[in-house]
Amino acid sequence: MGRVVAELVSSLLGLWLLLCSCGCPEGAELRAPPDKIAIIGAGIGGTSAAYYLRQKFGKDVKIDLFEREEVGGRLATMMVQGQEYEAGGSVIHPLNLRMKRFVKDLGLSTVQASGGLLGIYNGETLVFEESNWFIINVIKLVWRYGFQSLRMHMWVEDVLDKFMRIYRYQSHDYAFSSVEKLLHALGGDDFLGMLNRTLLETLQKAGFSEKFLNEMIAPVMRVNYGQSTDINAFVGAVSLSCSDSGLWAVEGGNKLVCSGLLQASKSNLISGSVMYIEEKTKTKHTGNPTKMYEVVYQIGTETRSDFYDIVLVATPLNRKMSNITFLNFDPPIEEFHQYYQHIVTTLVKGELNTSIFSSRPIDKFGLNTVLTTDNSDLFINSIGIVSSVREKEDPEPSTDGTYVWKIFSQETLTKAQILKLFLSYDYAVKKPWLAYPHYKPPEKCPSIILHDRLYYLNGIECAASAMEMSAIAAHNAALLAYHRWNRHTDMIDQDGLYEKLKTEL
């Protein structure tokens, strides 16, 4: 009798373990980790992905990270007379928890973003100028726009509050198979609607005036994304959040996060250009034929290749930016036509010709940054004094009136245009680049899953392009790759996560 009971208990225990392994990620039986993972692109997305993949798959996985240019990607710097200045992504929001965690884990130092007073120029006059006094700024804003600035702040806060849910989801290891499903999990149909409507349409419907949109909102879009209020409403909200106080940067340059993550992930950097990726059947050391991805790349004039279990593409699939070909996939990998915005960053060390913007004497000008409206005939999007990446404080007052100014423009500035902007200048350096997507809603985001074990990070940029967005996309892709490798389907695309996790508190 005792033997029968023991066998029955043993059978029930076995059944329970089987059921648990099918439905419980904590108790699930894990597959052996992959042997090799390739990541293409060593910007913030690629290096973040390497960091998270190492955390999930463990120390024995070999991770190769391909980069044809410098580690850091679009987090580039420019040199002016021996000093480095941020060329692109320069400020980080205090609620960007991924970037904050990276800086803490890597032991990096931070600096507060350059301050100073800001003005808005409409092509004829400064329609708004900041004051050193907070109460004066409030009076100016209320006098000109009523309480629209307060309403705008509340609108952005509401979007950010919902967006912050992603950190809780990812802390519980939940992943999403598409950008749309990720956004829907955060803000439901409202967030998807924002992706498919212009910022202008959204804010007009909310009752904001044309004057406020042209003078307060459009200039922010022009400086952050080189575009107008015709961008989608979601990226518009992300852009407006960058107007908050408490913005910061990494001392020494934001690109140090990328090199730090690369080192922390113990990945192998391959300084080469990936030419194509092809799925092939290969016999592994176990003796079983396995589907793998052959990555063919070029170092100098030499062409090489290697095989990988998982591949993450962390560079825009744009012919002008990566030019990767996908060979012999069935079905074929979809081609994306995500155009990227051409922008030119120019750094000039010189004395600003303030008479362009104001009739006040040069010593009474007082503004550190000037943004422009859409209907401005001026050939720049913005101009502002910048600190080098090593400076912990704002630049000291100049004894000769010269500062380093950063200018964003749609086209390369001519010498005549620089001479119009400056009374005199000592040095000028420019960087034309494809900095972020050209937003034209409705937006259809590229797939995250390109093939069985082939993933694409940069589709998140169709919603919004920012350092934090890339880090979040990298974490999501790493979780997605891990769960799909281990067949944890219950950790992907789960409905009702907000309510579910709220009840677990």
From Swiss-Prot:
- Family listed: Belongs to the prenylcysteine oxidase family.
Q: Which UniProt keywords apply?
A: FAD, Flavoprotein, Glycoprotein, Lysosome, Oxidoreductase, Signal
Signal peptide span: 1-27
Which one GO biological process term can you cite for this protein?
Answer: prenylcysteine catabolic process
Q: Origin organism of this chain? A: Pongo abelii (Sumatran orangutan)
EC number per UniProt: 1.8.3.5
Tell me what reaction this enzyme catalyses: an S-polyprenyl-L-cysteine + O2 + H2O = a polyprenal + L-cysteine + H2O2; S-(2E,6E)-farnesyl-L-cysteine + O2 + H2O = (2E,6E)-farnesal + L-cysteine + H2O2; [(2E,6E,10E)-geranylgeranyl]-L-cysteine + O2 + H2O = (2E,6E,10E)-geranylgeranial + L-cysteine + H2O2
Organism classification? Eukaryota, Metazoa, Chordata, Craniata, Vertebrata
| GO molecular function annotation | farnesylcysteine lyase activity; prenylcysteine oxidase activity
Give one Pfam family, short name only. Prenylcys_lyase
Q: Which cofactor(s) are needed, names only?
A: FAD
The terms describing its cellular component in GO are: lysosome
Q: Which residues are glycosylated?
A: N196, N323, N353
Reading the lineage from the top rank, the first entry is: Eukaryota
Give compartment(s).
Lysosome
State the function annotated in the UniProt record: Prenylcysteine oxidase that cleaves the thioether bond of prenyl-L-cysteines, such as farnesylcysteine and geranylgeranylcysteine. Only active against free prenylcysteines and not prenylcysteine residues within prenylated proteins or peptides. Involved in the final step in the degradation of prenylated proteins, by degrading prenylcysteines after the protein has been degraded.
Protein name as catalogued: Prenylcysteine oxidase 1
